[in-house]
């Protein structure tokens, strides 16, 4: 007979109706589906982990444990976890607004939006670190947005408990997000997550078309040498101070990298953005930047193709008119693409 108050094991029955697969390009050992949970009567996201790919049964619920331990408003929560004979199922809220990867597939975030996303992500990462964990898979597809446009860190499939001396070994990381120390030493530290946040910010301010155009023939060597990603290649409207902070987070030497999430947060909060330029693709080869200086008419900067060459023009924009901005030194035509971007760097320095 069980004595009163003694623990009692309960085996409950849970079910979910699996719907369409989402994030099909993400994760080699799992599938994520939009699903319906009849117990709570709503839409959820279910991540199914193949038990056959988890050789140690004691690790079946390791990802669920990490998500629960790192509970924070800037971390995607876990509702519950369960299992079938073949899979471990992690049940999470559905965020219909989508991920950072969705937002930057074509064009980048504005500087202010990128800074807000970075701050939210770092607050979540700080909570993860304070619970003795490394995330090890911070990238645009793992940054989701809630209905308040707050960024949350998702997917703890690669996370690990910090070992003795604050080091994690036995890594299973996404190759284009692997920091130099992981290639060199096969080990990760707190600075590893901060590098990945820096890389995520780099992608956010430049857009993934820009990032994905960088294809080094030897990724390992390019990462170790600091040539990938190209720290000098930024979209021309990105403020110089934001570029500096991102470079500090991407320092190839982890001992001189931004040391903590708190220090990274402090660096981002000190950045002043005078004009929050928004970049958009107007047509093939035609890019437009739109910004509104405080108390003044809006500005539009255009990079437009002219045959095989490029022109840069600047206009002021009001609710009723679009007029050429008369700064002859800033208008320029008949340039190569490279020369046009060099000129755009000058344009944004002058206008901002």
What are these regions (language model features)?
Residues 85-99, 103:
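Conserved short submotifs of the Hanks-type protein kinase catalytic core
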């Amino acid at each position: 007979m069980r004595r009163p108050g003694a623990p009692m094991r309960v085996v409950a029955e849970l079910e979910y109706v699996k719907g369409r697969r989402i994030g099909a390009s993400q994760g080699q050992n799992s599938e994520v589906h939009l699903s319906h949970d009849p117990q709570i009567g709503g839409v959820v996201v279910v991540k199914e982990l193949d038990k056959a790919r988890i050789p140690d049964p004691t690790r079946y619920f390791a990802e669920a444990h990490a998500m629960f331990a790192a509970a924070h408003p800037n971390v995607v929560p876990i509702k519950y976890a369960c299992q079938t004979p073949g899979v471990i199922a992690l049940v999470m809220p559905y965020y219909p607004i989508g991920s950072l990867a969705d937002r930057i597939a074509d064009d980048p975030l504005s500087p202010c939006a990128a800074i807000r996303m970075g701050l939210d992500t770092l607050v979540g990462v700080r909570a993860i670190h304070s619970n003795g964990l490394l995330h090890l898979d911070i990238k645009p597809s793992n940054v989701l947005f809630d209905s308040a446009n707050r960024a949350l860190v998702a997917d703890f499939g690669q996370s690990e408990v910090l070992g003795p001396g604050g080091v994690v070994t036995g890594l299973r990381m996404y190759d284009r997000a692997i920091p130099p120390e992981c290639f060199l030493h096969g080990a990760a530290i707190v600075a590893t997550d901060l590098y990945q946040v820096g890389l995520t910010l780099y992608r956010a301010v430049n857009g993934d078309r820009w990032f994905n155009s960088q294809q080094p023939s030897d990724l390992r060597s390019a990462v170790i040498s600091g040539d990938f990603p190209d720290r000098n290649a930024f979209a021309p409207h990105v403020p110089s101070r934001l570029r500096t902070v991102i470079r500090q987070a991407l320092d190839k030497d982890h001992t001189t990298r931004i040391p903590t999430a708190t220090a990274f947060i402090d660096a981002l909060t000190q950045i002043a953005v005078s004009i929050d330029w928004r970049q958009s693709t107007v047509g093939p080869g035609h890019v437009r930047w739109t910004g509104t200086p405080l108390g003044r008419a809006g500005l539009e900067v255009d990079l437009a193709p002219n045959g095989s060459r490029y022109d840069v023009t600047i206009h002021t924009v009001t609710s009723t008119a679009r007029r050429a901005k008369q700064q002859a030194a800033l208008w320029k035509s008949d340039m190569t693409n490279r020369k046009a971007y060099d000129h755009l760097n000058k344009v944004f320095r002058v206008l901002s």
